[in-house]
Design a protein with these regions (language model features):
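Hydrophobic alpha-helical and helix-loop surface patches within well-folded domains
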Residues: 18, 294, 403, 449-749
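Non-catalytic accessory/interaction domains
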Residues: 171, 180, 185-241, 281, ...
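Hydrophobic helix-coil surface modules that form long, contiguous segments used
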Residues: 228-232, 236-265, 269-275, 281-285, ...
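Bacterial N-terminal signal peptides
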Residues: 3-16
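N-terminal, polar/Ser/Thr-rich
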Residues: 19-261, 363-365, 716-721, 729
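Solvent-exposed beta-hairpin/edge-strand motifs
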Residues: 275-305, 368-370, 376-380, 766-775, ...
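Glycine/proline-rich low-complexity spacer/linker segments in large multi-domain proteins
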Residues: 233-238, 319-322, 328-329, 338-376, ...
């Protein structure tokens, strides 16, 4: 133990901690090079990191130059054609093995490689040096030490940018190596370049993935991600966030060009001991210029990143601060961020796009807290935001508005434009709907050119050219008249009525929402978003479905924009803003609940036929085939969340999370019954108010409402099949009847195809008999054929499989 303590103590003081020490030492980290004096010719070096096993069979191992007295990088490279290494990984769950197989073709990662660039703040360096001593073959190679850095130093420098802030933080904070991270970039094998990461900050610490370029865009494909073995067995603990922010007070100044200058104050609560570097997330479009802690300036660190995994696709920057003395865990401090930039774009037509809606202020996680927001903006504009409007004043070309939250919320946002507004009262609640006076440039109709005759030039033709296939009279194209642009304000009252109806429907069934006032406001584009008390709805949701451009869309898209999407985003006032999730693997719950809530409202508004038509469309989208002939639903289990989006299945994340998510809830409703299902939703809202809900929490809560005689009382089989696995079966029923009334023996077989033999489900059949009677029976099906018997009083006249449409399946007569 003593050597480790000595190393940790040395880390605390090896970096100079004078004014500006953070950026100075970040530069030292950025300048780390491979150490020519620490290059070894190696054979059979074994390194185990959690579930990952590395075998450096033959090649060179060269360490990076030490920083703060500690080695944080190393490179293995195969120097000869017969050299190489091997990485082996056996994911612990069926779901992750399926995911790995989807990308690599095998459920186990067993890849030979030529190079491995390693970065770490754990005990990897010590483990490698210990392994070197076990075989006399492993010797220093000065010649290779002189040769390798020239080629590999630029690569290491580039990759270090992704982890430099973590290296600095761990080094100066003197953390136990058990809480350190590990990352490796592997290349030279059949799978191309890929990354492995062990990040103690995450619930799923082990991650393997690859950056892919396809169809003119990047995808980060996470092959597998899971809890590390030592974390699962209690030998290592998940690392806490170093601090959290509470009670935001944000003052924003918008100039005439809508550039922002912001001062964001918050209560700063340190959590971990001996921490001198703290990281926050902020939009890439904003530049942090100054930070004060308890009124004193602290150093700002604008860094490249904090982890290797998915860094290239991160939409936000990781910014840090370096403090001279570590604050005491549990103490309270005031922090003040000064930053500026541009997150608002001009979409044309007096319409503005507010980007970076979740990162326009510094964050560390999404905890429920209070917000006080003040905006100063051009007087000709209107601005809405989360929270209750406290006051608005105007003068000298500037308008100022203050908003304050009355209940804790997770996210604060704003929107602006030139609005016309209407208000609806829903009991004690207020629904305000804003519409832009015009539409964005992309929705304005293009002018159609007119063809007109031009005056002849020179002498007239004496005879027609026999080779011309058009009149010899010259023509020219001139700009014709533009059709009038759509007017969002014409349907403002209709949008307000619909919004109020949906809001009232949800209040009556789910209970109190996140805030007492809700504002629906327009945003360019095709998608929306639901913040606490603030709904972003696309301009398309305001337009007449019988006029261009909506008139030219399929009927299902017109319904989506004008009814479903607004209802979905309003439902997020409950699902996401009262009840939330903390892990990405549970994020599907919020989208599925919002999607199905919109379907419940549509069912109440337009009847069950409208709901079933949409469920059929959702099923068809899940069954659509990609270029390899695979259905979208097969991309992975719904709990993979954002990981479902890949180059093979670009649409899979949305289709599975939203559409299959709605089907999962619809099937659950079929099991519980209508009353119990609605009671479940209300129970979740009440029991998880301002708390995080996990998938397993949801299963346990739903199990409380399962009928007593249900064969899967804890819903474990249901969740194992529909939530944690994939598959949509094709079902059919074969049957025959023997005997005479009043004792007719009915024998049936439920046939299940296009799914694995292990696929299990509960499917209902309805057996009709004369005179006009029927028996509704659930069948527990597994495998290709499941036999069932029923004794009837009368002969069957027909059998209907899943008559209430409560099973996600293709049904054959």
């Amino acid at each position: 133990m003593a050597p480790i303590l000595f190393v940790l103590a040395s880390l605390l003081f090896a970096f100079p901690l004078s004014a500006g020490w953070g950026e100075e030492n970040l530069e030292k980290i950025r300048e780390i090079r491979l150490d020519p004096d620490q290059c070894y010719r190696v054979r059979d070096i074994f390194l185990e990191r959690e579930d990952l096993k590395f075998y450096f069979v033959d090649g060179h191992l060269i360490f990076g130059q030490p920083v703060a007295g500690r080695t944080v990088a190393a490179l293995f490279v195969a120097s000869e054609p017969t050299d190489g290494g091997e990485i082996i990984l056996f994911p612990p769950s069926k779901r992750e093995r399926q995911s790995l197989s989807r990308f690599t073709g095998q459920p186990v990662l067993n890849e030979k490689f030529r190079t491995a660039m390693l970065f770490f703040t754990d005990d990897t360096a010590e483990a490698l040096r210990s392994a070197l001593q076990k075989d006399e073959f492993n010797q220093l190679d000065p010649e290779a030490g002189r040769r390798l850095p020239g080629r590999w130093d630029p690569v290491m420098k580039n990759l270090l940018r992704s982890v430099e802030l973590a290296v600095l933080s761990d080094a100066v904070s003197g953390r136990d190596p058990q809480s350190g991270f590990f990352g490796a970039v592997i290349s030279g094998g059949t799978l191309g370049r890929f990354e492995v990461v062990i990040d103690p900050h995450r619930d799923e610490q082990v991650s393997v993935g690859q950056l892919v370029w396809s169809d003119s865009r990047d995808y980060y494909e996470a092959w597998c991600r899971f809890e590390g073995r030592n974390f699962a067995q209690g030998r290592r603990a998940k690392r806490e966030d170093e601090a959290r922010l509470e009670d935001y007070r944000i003052e924003s100044h918008l100039d005439q060009e809508l550039g922002m200058k912001v001062v964001a104050q918050a209560t700063f609560l340190p959590i971990t001991a001996n921490t001198k570097v703290f990281a926050f997330e902020l939009s890439r479009r904003l530049r942090l210029t100054k930070v004060l802690l308890d009124g004193e300036p602290v150093e700002v660190l604008n860094s490249g990143g904090h982890t290797l995994a998915d860094t290239p696709l991160r939409r936000n920057n990781i910014v840090g601060i370096a403090v001279p003395d570590p604050p005491v865990p549990g103490s309270r401090h005031e922090i003040e961020f000064h930053y500026e930039g541009r997150v608002i774009g001009d979409a044309g037509g007096g319409v503005y796009y507010v980007g970076s809606r979740e990162s326009w202020y510094p964050r560390r996680g999404n905890r429920f807290t209070s917000f006080d927001l003040r905006f100063h903006y051009p007087e000709q504009l209107d601005l809405v935001a989360t929270g209750k409007l406290v006051e608005t004043t105007s003068g000298e070309g500037t308008r100022s508005s203050q908003f304050h939250t009355e209940t804790p919320i997770r996210l604060a946002g704003f929107n602006l434009g030139v609005y016309k507004r209407v208000t609806r009262k829903v009991g004690d609640y207020t629904v305000e709907v804003c519409a832009n006076q015009g539409v964005e440039r992309s929705l304005k109709p293009l002018a159609k050119p007119d063809v007109v005759a031009a005056a002849p030039i020179g002498a007239p033709r004496r005879r027609r050219d026999p080779f011309r296939e058009f009149p010899s009279t010259p023509t020219v194209l001139v700009e014709g008249k533009r059709a009038p642009p759509p007017e969002p304000t014409l349907r403002l009252d209709a949008v307000a009525d619909l919004s109020a109806q949906a809001f009232k429907f949800f209040v009556e069934r789910f209970g109190p929402p996140a805030t007492r006032e809700i504002v629906v406001s327009p945003i360019p584009g095709e998608s929306g978003q639901g913040f606490p008390g603030l709904v972003y709805a696309p301009t398309l949701s305001y337009l007449d479905p019988d006029e261009p451009p909506l008139r030219d869309l399929p009927a299902r898209d017109r319904l989506f924009y004008t009814q479903l999407l607004p209802a979905h985003e309003i439902a997020h006032q409950w699902w996401g803003n009262v009840v939330t999730v903390s892990e990405s693997s549970d994020g599907w719950l919020m989208e599925a609940l919002a999607t199905y809530s919109a379907l419940l409202w549509l069912e109440d508004h337009s009847g069950p036929e409208a709901r079933d038509e949409l469920l059929l469309q959702y099923k068809n989208k899940l069954l659509e085939l990609n270029e390899d002939g695979e259905p979208v639903e097969s991309a992975g289990a719904i709990v993979l969340g954002d990981r479902l989006r890949s180059s093979e299945f670009p649409s899979a994340r949305n289709v599975i999370v939203y559409d299959k998510g709605a089907w999962i809830l619809h099937m659950l409703r079929g099991i519980l019954g209508d009353d119990n299902f609605l009671a479940l939703l209300r129970s979740i809202r009440d029991n998880y108010q301002f708390k995080s809900l996990s998938t397993e929490d949801f299963r346990s809560e739903a199990a409380r409402f399962v009928p007593q005689d249900w064969p899967d009382p804890q819903l474990e089989n249901f969740f194992d099949q529909w939530v944690y696995d994939t598959g949509i079966p094709t079902l059919s029923v074969q049957y025959h009847a023997e005997g005479t009334p009043p004792r007719v023996r009915f024998s049936g077989h439920l046939i299940q195809q296009n799914v694995p033999e292990s696929f299990t489900l509960m499917a209902p059949v309805e057996i009709h008999t004369s005179p006009g009677r029927s028996l509704y029976k659930w069948i527990a099906a597994q495998g290709e054929s499941t036999e069932f018997d029923v004794v009837l009083r009368n002969k069957p006249t027909r059998v209907v499989l899943d008559p209430k449409n409560v099973v996600l399946a293709v049904k054959r007569d």
